Amino acid sequence: MRKWTVPSVLFLLCPSLSSSCQGRKIHANAEADSDAPVDPPKVEDKIGAVPNGLSTDSDVAKREAESMSMRNLRSDAEKFEFQAEVSRLMDIIINSLYSNKDIFLRELISNASDALDKIRFLALTDKEILGEGDTAKLEIQIKLDKEKKILSIRDRGIGMTKEDLIKNLGTIAKSGTSAFVEKMQTSGDLNLIGQFGVGFYSVYLVPDYVEVISKHNDDKQYIWESKADGAFAISEDVWNEPLGRGTEIRLHLRDEAQEYLDEFKLKELVKRYSEFINFPIYLWASKEVEVEVPAEEDDSSDDEDNKSESSSSEEGEEEETEKEEDEKKPKTKKVKETTYEWELLNDMKAIWLRNPKDVTDDEYTKFYHSLAKDFSEEKPLAWSHFTAEGDVEFKAFTLLPPKAPQDLYESYYNSNKSNLKLYVRRVFISDEFDELLPKYLNFLKGLVDSDTLPLNVSREMLQQHSSLKTIKKKLIRKALDMIRKIADEDPDEANDKDKKEVEESTDNDEKKGQYAKFWNEFGKSIKLGIIEDAANRNRLAKLLRFESTKSEGKLTSLDQYISRMKSGQKDIFYITGTSKEQLEKSPFLERLTKKNYEVILFTDPVDEYLMQYLMDYEDKKFQNVSKEGLKIGKDSKDKELKESFKELTKWWKGALASENVDDVKISNRLANTPCVVVTSKYGWSSNMERIMQSQTLSDASKQAYMRGKRVLEINPRHPIIKELRERVVKDAEDESVKQTARLMYQTALMESGFMLNDPKEFASSIYDSVKSSLKISPDATVEEEDDTEEAEAESGTTESSAAEDAGAETLDLKDEL
């Protein structure tokens, strides 16, 4: 007989299932039949009701009630002792302080599903094995009894023989149990349950007494019971109604586990963990309805007796007529009553198991709203539905929401929460990890369903699982392809030469502007991906969008930029700043714009970090136009100008020695501005300096190191620069000329986006310049205030305060009297 792992122990195997490939066959057939209609149980049906053709003992109910009330092992049952390791295991589980006890229901439903899978597989070759009537219904039922504090889970699966009950509920492979106990003692994490084949023992998280009633087609009905005290008992079941076939588990809940007698709690757990189980899950749920009941005589309306005697005779006649008609009608009233009926909890089908070609857009949209708990009417921007085959087989379904959550980036690096849910054989495992998708794609909603990952896999084991890297790699590729497809189908994203052709071939206006919508919501995530994911950096770069000096207020891509590059242009030009308006006025763009070069405008703070990682694209380097190294063609007069201003540049560098200026050079980027300050190629730009200085925990020493060298570039064609050269040639020691040179440098710093180290000094220089232009003597001083008037004012204030204090004291005295 094949050994099955204990997560499916409850509803165990059949001796005929010996082939190693049967498990896969079971699931394959389960998928094929998953949409088969199943009639819900009737309202009057009971868990464990007698199937057609079977009789019941008249004293069954009495003996059953006595057994439940005692919560003791039956005296005539055959008793067994658990293995030593199992006893230790249950002690750890029961006494653990770990809060997630909810997994017990997931385990039991998963086991029930396994049992139903097995009986359905056997029925493929022998239809009679299913039986008739209710016994043939492949479903799971959950029922609770608040008075007796019992939670019952029932299935009509394969059931267990007496031997199965002993073998699978009382023993575990010693090596697996020992390893599990050791792991539990060190980590205390109950999510490890099931990884070592001990899933059934999670039931001891909530009850102090467990009954497992099971009927296999090849054996009598037996009852397995345990109080988790190191022993269990098995006896032929003569206390309960015949099951027909299948298993029912009754959990006699401890006082501290009464929350699991709440219908809402059970519905929530089923929705969370077992929503896509292959079989219908029903809950015996209460429901308030209004019903009409006969009204008592005292409740009958006697409004006619209280009518005012002043009523008109006509009104009286009408009332008499109405009264006669009312007397003819049966007297009833509406009251609220609590009724019970079987409520289907998992009506949402696992559409990822179907062929994508067979799923409609409306079905995808409906599934998105259910999965994402999005109650708006907006459709997802896109979705990706695929099956991966090969060494690792899994099905995946990812969706792109229409809007980003408000807190998407608030805890970007600190949260383990993922919007991608992991399922194993349609059983929800976890969303408390980020190993299946990188953080920058965490805005995607969806799920992964794998048959190769172990059930109840923990975050720690998931990180080490050999299949994980393969799954992650395929998910990333499919996600980026999905996003790329939005751009490819958007007419606004076509190159200028292809736009007309795309617009003519596109008859779906819904796709127009979709990528701009995506970028406005999730563009920052793509930039973070370029920073974090070196392997997919080029793919992500194709998804970048930005404004430029030629984009006319619209977003453009790197491919579109390259298609518009001038002949002979080797670099991709860009500049960073706080806003588009500020950058368009930047002196760094003057000559580039004049020569019709396109410059990318980066205005997001993350763009500074982005460009530290995105060094090139399609064999073209990126060049920050506010840094050294800008090449935009040579001027025939460059050498002549450089020689002509050699004396000025040398003098100016010396005059700015205290400002830590590395050099003064002739500029090739200025047209109308006299001078600008640029930084070294690998140093921080002015925008980056401002960002880093705003950081709460910034390191001053690192800032000084990363600031880079500053170079003053002058415009040799500007009249101010020409005049300054003449002044220097005439008298290089003129203090006013030196002051003018320093003032121009400080002004250039501000215009280039830098922050001044000493704003007060700069302001004083400006005021001195204003004095000079107004022909005010440099020795002129500010008129001093008259101290006498100030002293008299202070004296008057003191006397007034004293008078007010005296008046206040008088009032206080009057109040006391």
From Swiss-Prot:
Record GO cellular component, one term: endoplasmic reticulum lumen
Residues bearing attached sugar chains per UniProt: N111, N306, N416, N456, N624
The keyword Chaperone belongs to this UniProt entry's keyword annotation: yes
Signal peptide (UniProt feature, chain positions): 1-20
Acidic residues bias: start-end ranges: 293-325, 781-793
Tissue-level expression: Not detected in extracts from young plants unless they are exposed to heat shock for several hours. Found to be constitutively expressed in cell cultures.
UniProt motif (Prevents secretion from ER) ranges: 814-817
Keywords: ATP-binding, Calcium, Chaperone, Endoplasmic reticulum, Glycoprotein, Nucleotide-binding, Signal
GO molecular function terms noted in the UniProt entry: ATP binding; ATP hydrolysis activity; ATP-dependent protein folding chaperone; unfolded protein binding
Ranges annotated as spanning the membrane: none
Gene3D superfamilies (UniProt xref): 3.30.230.80, 3.40.50.11260, Heat shock protein 90, C-terminal domain, Histidine kinase-like ATPase, C-terminal domain
Amino acids binding ATP: N111, D155, N168, F200
SMART domains associated with the record: HATPase_c
Residue ranges with Low complexity bias: 794-805
Localisation: Endoplasmic reticulum lumen
Pfam entry (one): HSP90
CDD domains for the chain: HATPase_Hsp90-like
Annotated spans, Disordered: 31-58, 293-333, 777-817
Site residues by UniProt (Important for ATP hydrolysis): R459
Family matches, as PANTHER family: HEAT SHOCK PROTEIN 90 FAMILY MEMBER
Known function: May have a molecular chaperone role in the processing of secreted materials.
Family: Belongs to the heat shock protein 90 family.
Protein name per Swiss-Prot or TrEMBL: Endoplasmin homolog
